[in-house]
């Protein structure tokens, strides 16, 4: 569906060339939700703007739906852009137009007749849950409602691809989840390919099938979201995963608990997919002559399955503890010793 081959974007500056995207290679399948995550300055905004040619690549090739979009210009590019919708962090609505008129705007530009425009706008207002707000102006809407207008407008011309440029960064957590649920619903209903960029791992976890991690213009890691959660390879990826699995407060709590358990071992168990539902601790206590205390635990649901972790204290004879650890490995649960007496 979408293919990036050795794509590079270099900006000219007085202080010298700035490489925003450095030899990016990506393949995004039709109908998937693909996330790109990175901190500020990683190059992700430059990358997503290459998809619809708001930015031209310095080198490399971009293919969308078997069309080399990086090689076309003029009317052909304008037509291709109608098949690529985009929503933005700050909505980019026309403040002098109503909700209906904002959604209708790209249809006007495309030359769609008035009756068809009206019908399409009605469909989109229903799709994004804005019934009864069609005559309101952007200033009368909440942040979440404004983004719903942005989504409806982006879908006006029935695009094959929807680009999301930090679409939830300006929203509160509850509204963020509502918008993410809407994007999930649209993806399932329309079979729409969604590419989103974000600096929040929560967004990736909640709706993405696969993720690419960017750092200093380079794509340093890609893979299914659950695989990245389970086994992050790069330091930056590990930091993003820790946003959800290890908060600063959690780490401080674990450190204080470790001080209370000077004997035995404190271990972290990681559960992936079906392993989340296994009675691992019950089996451990049944077959081992040790004491088991749960210090901390959490579970997260990704679009590919569940991911969870437990921090537990194992206390008893050293031989019994080692046998318990071997038993945990046999249950195909990943284990890390984080402290031992």
Swiss-Prot record:
Catalytic activity field: L-methionine(out) + ATP + H2O = L-methionine(in) + ADP + phosphate + H(+); D-methionine(out) + ATP + H2O = D-methionine(in) + ADP + phosphate + H(+)
Signal peptide: none
GO MF, one annotated term: ATP hydrolysis activity
GO cellular component annotations of the record: plasma membrane
EC number: 7.4.2.11
One family name in Pfam for this protein: NIL
Chief location bin: membrane
Enzyme class of the recorded protein, top EC level: translocase
Residues in coiled coil: none
Domain ABC transporter stretches: 2-241
Keywords assigned: Amino-acid transport, ATP-binding, Cell membrane, Membrane, Nucleotide-binding, Translocase, Transport
Record-listed ATP binding positions: 38-45
Compartments in which it is found: Cell membrane
Keyword field contains rRNA-binding: no
Membrane-protein topology: Peripheral membrane protein
PROSITE patterns: ABC_TRANSPORTER_1 (PS00211), ABC_TRANSPORTER_2 (PS50893), METN (PS51264)
Cited function: Part of the ABC transporter complex MetNIQ involved in methionine import. Responsible for energy coupling to the transport system.
Annotated family: Belongs to the ABC transporter superfamily. Methionine importer (TC 3.A.1.24) family.
PANTHER family assigned: AMINO ACID IMPORT ATP-BINDING PROTEIN, METHIONINE IMPORT ATP-BINDING PROTEIN METN 2
SUBUNIT field: The complex is composed of two ATP-binding proteins (MetN), two transmembrane proteins (MetI) and a solute-binding protein (MetQ).
Protein name: Methionine import ATP-binding protein MetN 3
Organism: Bacillus cereus (strain ZK / E33L)
Highest classification ranks of the organism: Bacteria, Bacillati, Bacillota, Bacilli, Bacillales
Annotated gene: metN3
């Amino acid at each position: 569906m979408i293919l990036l081959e050795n794509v590079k974007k270099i900006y000219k500056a007085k202080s010298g060339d700035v490489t925003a995207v450095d030899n990016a290679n990506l393949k995004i399948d039709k109908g998937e939700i693909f996330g790109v995550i990175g901190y500020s300055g990683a190059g992700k905004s430059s990358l997503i703007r290459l998809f619809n040619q708001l930015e031209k690549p310095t080198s490399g090739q971009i293919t969308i739906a078997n069309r080399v979009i990086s090689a076309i210009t003029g009317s052909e590019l304008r037509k291709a852009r109608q098949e690529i919708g985009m929503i933005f962090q700050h909505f980019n609505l026309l403040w002098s137009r109503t909700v209906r008129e904002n959604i209708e705007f790209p249809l006007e530009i495309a030359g769609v007749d008035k009756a068809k425009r009206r019908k399409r706008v009605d469909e989109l207002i229903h799709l994004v849950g804005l019934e009864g707000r069609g005559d309101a102006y952007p200033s009368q809407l909440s942040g979440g409602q404004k983004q719903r207008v942005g989504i409806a407008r982006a879908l006006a011309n029935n695009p094959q691809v929807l680009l999301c440029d930090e679409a939830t960064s300006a929203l509160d957590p509850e509204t963020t989840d509502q918008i993410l649920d809407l994007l999930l619903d649209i993806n399932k209903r329309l079979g729409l390919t969604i590419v989103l960029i974000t600096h929040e791992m929560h967004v990736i976890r909640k709706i993405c099938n696969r993720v690419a991690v960017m750092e200093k213009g380079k794509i340093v890691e890609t893979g299914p979201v659950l695989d990245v959660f389970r086994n992050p390879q790069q330091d930056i990826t590990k930091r993003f995963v820790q946003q959800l699995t290890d908060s600063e407060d959690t780490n401080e709590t674990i450190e204080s608990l470790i001080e209370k358990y000077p004997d035995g071992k404190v271990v972290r168990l990681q559960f992936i997919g079906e392993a989340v539902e296994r009675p691992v601790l019950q089996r451990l206590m049944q077959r081992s002559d040790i004491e088991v205390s749960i210090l901390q635990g959490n579970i997260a649901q990704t679009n590919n399955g569940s991911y969870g972790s437990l921090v537990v204290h194992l206390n008893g004879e050293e031989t019994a503890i080692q046998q318990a650890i071997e038993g945990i490995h046999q249950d195909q649960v990943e284990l890390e010793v984080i402290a031992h007496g």
